[in-house]
From Swiss-Prot:
Gene Ontology molecular function: structural constituent of ribosome
SUPFAM superfamilies according to UniProt: Ribosomal protein L29 (L29p)
GO biological process per UniProt: translation
Protein's name according to its UniProt entry: Large ribosomal subunit protein uL29
Keywords: Ribonucleoprotein, Ribosomal protein
Family: Belongs to the universal ribosomal protein uL29 family.
InterPro entries associated with the record: Ribosomal_protein_uL29 (IPR050063), Ribosomal_uL29 (IPR001854), Ribosomal_uL29_CS (IPR018254), Ribosomal_uL29_sf (IPR036049)
Coiled coil regions, renumbered to chain: none
Example of a GO cellular component annotation carried by this entry: cytosolic large ribosomal subunit
Organism name: Cronobacter sakazakii (strain ATCC BAA-894)
Pfam family, one: Ribosomal_L29
Amino acid sequence: MKAKELREKSVEELNTELLNLLREQFNLRMQAASGQLQQTHLLKQVRRDVARVKTLLTEKAGA
């Protein structure tokens, strides 16, 4: 997910996106713990997407 795409979204859409990412992160962690996760790079990718969304939410709250 590109930061440029995220910047165009509203705070409400960002909160929804954050919730979806956190759910996906949970599911990926459960798959990794049970040994079912084949694409381990997704853990890092989702973690960084969560950070991007949280950063933008903080920026929009301050503005």
